[in-house]
């Protein structure tokens, strides 16, 4: 799965996850612990892979390309913007986009489309 981690890391990186609804759209909240948030600030791909593995262990239904990309974005970007944020919101309804688009959207691509979809109600 990934290369061995530095002995400075303490596993797991993710404390718990919780499926919720935002308006009428489903969202997975992934709660990183202190070690997970600290490791997100390191240029260590193995730590990101291990943390994503924690998410999948806790919520196997999260195993989609778009949710993985959102999680990695939160680790690489959002931790610097909102360092005290304890959870990452990952939504399966968001579009799969390239790295530059997901970073430009603050890790939440397709936000306006999702809101419109939620406001229109279930289909």
From Swiss-Prot:
InterPro entries: DUF2599. It comes from the Bacteria. To M.tuberculosis Rv0477. This is Uncharacterized protein ML2452. It comes from Mycobacterium leprae (strain TN).
């Amino acid at each position: 799965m990934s290369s061995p981690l530095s002995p400075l890391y303490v596993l797991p990186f993710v404390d718990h996850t919780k499926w919720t609804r935002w308006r009428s759209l489903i969202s997975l909240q992934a709660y990183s612990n202190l070690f997970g948030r600290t490791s997100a600030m390191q240029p260590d791909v193995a730590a990101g892979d291990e943390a994503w593995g924690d998410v999948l262990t806790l919520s196997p239904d999260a195993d989609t390309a778009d949710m993985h990309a959102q999680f990695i974005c939160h680790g690489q970007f959002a931790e610097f913007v909102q360092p005290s944020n304890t959870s990452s919101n990952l939504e399966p309804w968001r579009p799969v986009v390239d790295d530059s688009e997901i970073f430009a959207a603050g890790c939440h691509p397709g936000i306006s489309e999702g809101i419109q979809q939620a406001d229109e109600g279930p289909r």
